[in-house]
């Protein structure tokens, strides 16, 4: 039976804490609850075990699909998957080694050097990185709304707290660009704990900011000031932090023809009857533009495993192998909106899922 949690709302607590277990509904054989975490009597994925996975709301649907399939093939293994956001997931994952910490974490961006340092300081020295595939960060609007076309400069100028180092005065899109409609700026997007927020900063806001040569020069002369000017988002209500529940974000945007939303491509792909993509820099996201990375919001997504747990839980190794089998072109995850890697990158990801080589910190520099 499945032990995969429904995607919790934005205020849901971690299932890794006792006080939140009653807030999340799971279906689970009683025997699995009593199984010893470190038992490996059968020496493989069939061993009674429990895998705990946290992290990105973007990667959540893909990992959930793999977990469902994996549990059907391995009834002795139960899998918990919780959507916490990338940043919160990394914090939990890197908190230490042992039964009360996650075995894996989903991420809609690559792990940061600072996060890997936290892992190491807490005894997590074998962080295994598996690239899942490619996703596209998208800006969406209701399918009933008048289609919008934005540049990254427009988006940055609308959302920045101090666009190009100046006070934010724009109330409507027309204030940003005379060619845009005179509707109030209202964008629903990810909170700071989300990897999608990091991607919004890096892929959209920084690029829009650096369309001004002075901002590129600022990066060289004062990187801290550049980061503040280019990525700090206004807090006057024009940008609304919508939590980690992307399905709820889709519902809110589809009900408001004047609102835009920021989320991963897979949620757009699953809800084309409700929302459409906003054209950015003359491009709309699709499988082709994301695969070849020509779409400005294209990004790799990941799952990370804790190498220290594999001996006690050999099911982790088998779970990653199952994940790798499902990510290929024409595979089950493609039908759920995952954009597979091109052949060379796919082969490298498959090799990593087999080798399980710990991440080299130097590769993050």
Feature locations, PLM:
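Short, low-complexity disordered leader/linker segments with a strong preference
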Residues: 1-50, 363-364
């Amino acid at each position: 039976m499945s032990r995969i949690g429904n995607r919790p709302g934005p205020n849901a607590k971690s299932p890794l804490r006792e006080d939140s277990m009653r807030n999340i509904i799971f279906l689970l054989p009683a025997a699995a609850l009593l199984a010893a975490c470190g038992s490996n009597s059968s020496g493989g994925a069939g061993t009674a075990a429990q895998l705990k996975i946290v992290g990105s709301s973007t990667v959540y649907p893909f990992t959930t699909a793999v977990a469902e399939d994996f549990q059907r093939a391995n009834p002795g293994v139960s899998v918990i998957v919780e959507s916490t956001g990338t940043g919160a997931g990394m914090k939990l994952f890197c908190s230490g080694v042992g039964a009360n910490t996650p075995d894996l974490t989903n991420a809609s961006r690559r792990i940061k050097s600072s996060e890997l340092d936290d892992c190491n300081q807490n005894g997590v020295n074998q962080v295994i990185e598996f690239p899942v595939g490619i996703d596209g960060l998208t800006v969406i609007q209701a399918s009933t709304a008048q289609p919008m076309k934005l540049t990254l400069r427009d988006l940055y100028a609308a959302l920045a707290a101090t666009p190009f180092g100046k006070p934010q005065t724009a109330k409507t899109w027309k204030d940003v660009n005379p060619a845009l409609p005179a509707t109030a700026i209202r964008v629903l997007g990810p909170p700071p704990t989300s990897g999608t927020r990091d991607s919004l900063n890096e892929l959209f806001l920084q690029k829009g900011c650096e369309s001004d040569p002075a901002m590129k020069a600022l990066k060289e002369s004062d990187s801290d000031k550049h980061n503040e000017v280019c990525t700090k988002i206004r807090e006057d209500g024009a940008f609304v932090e919508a939590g980690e529940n992307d399905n709820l974000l889709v519902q809110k945007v589809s009900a408001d023809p004047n609102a835009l939303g920021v989320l991963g491509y897979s949620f757009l792909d699953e809800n084309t009857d409700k929302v459409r993509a906003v054209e950015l820099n003359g491009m709309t996201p699709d499988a082709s533009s994301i695969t070849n990375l020509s779409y400005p919001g294209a990004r790799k997504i990941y799952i990370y495993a804790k190498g220290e747990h594999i001996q006690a839980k050999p099911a982790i190794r088998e779970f990653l192998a199952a994940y790798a089998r499902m990510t290929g072109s024409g595979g089950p995850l493609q039908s759920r909106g995952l954009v597979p890697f091109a052949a060379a990158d796919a082969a490298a990801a498959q090799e990593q899922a087999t080798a399980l080589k710990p991440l080299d910190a130097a590769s993050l520099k």
